[in-house]
């Protein structure tokens, strides 16, 4: 993963995403995870590093542990998922924010399909959203409809 991150930086990428090693998290190899994130962050600096944790595959305690590790290792963002494993819920965001507060930025991917969901997550402190094309169109239509009916 370190080699790929360096290659992506050299290729001109503006930011880097990496997926947290869930197997190591579930096996309790927490120092290994922190070291890996720290090494990649050092290699791609000053580019922003987003660490994806796939919250739908983790227990509440694992989400809290992963959030702490990501923050401690110096990443710029916690990203809740790739968008493929399932929907991020308000409960997932609560767990992350309860653990790290506003000390690190949060990006949600997966499950943002309505304007109300987006607004609620934004009010909870989510700074970025990964939204699929169809959902983005639907959310924009909701915005337009609300604006024209108010």
Model regions and ranges:
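Active-site beta->alpha loop and helix N-cap motifs at the rims of alpha/beta catalytic domains
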Residues: 1-43, 48, 55-63
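Catalytic cores of alpha/beta
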Residues: 1-7, 58-69, 93-98, 102, ...
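Glycine-rich phosphate-binding active-site loops on the catalytic face of alpha/beta enzymes
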Residues: 10-25, 72-89, 110-114, 122-146
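Generic alpha-helix signal with a bias toward terminal, lower-confidence helices
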Residues: 25-32, 37, 61-65, 69-70, ...
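Alpha-helix-loop-beta-strand connector modules within alpha/beta enzyme cores
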Residues: 28-55, 72-73, 87-114, 146-150
């Amino acid at each position: 993963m370190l080699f790929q991150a360096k290659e992506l930086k050299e290729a001109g990428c503006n930011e880097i995403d990496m997926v947290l090693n869930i197997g190591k998290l579930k096996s309790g190899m927490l120092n290994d995870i922190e070291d890996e994130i720290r090494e990649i962050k050092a290699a791609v600096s000053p580019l922003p590093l987003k660490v994806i944790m796939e919250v739908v595959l983790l227990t509440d305690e694992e989400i809290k542990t992963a959030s702490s590790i990501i923050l401690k290792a110096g990443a710029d963002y916690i990203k809740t998922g790739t968008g493929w494993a399932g929907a991020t819920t308000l409960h997932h965001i609560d767990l992350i924010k309860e653990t790290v507060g506003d000390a690190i930025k949060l990006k949600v991917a997966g499950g943002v399909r309505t304007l109300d969901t987006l607004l609620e997550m934004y009010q909870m402190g989510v700074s970025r959203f990964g939204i699929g094309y169809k959902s983005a169109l639907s959310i924009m239509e909701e915005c337009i409809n609300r604006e024209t009916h108010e």
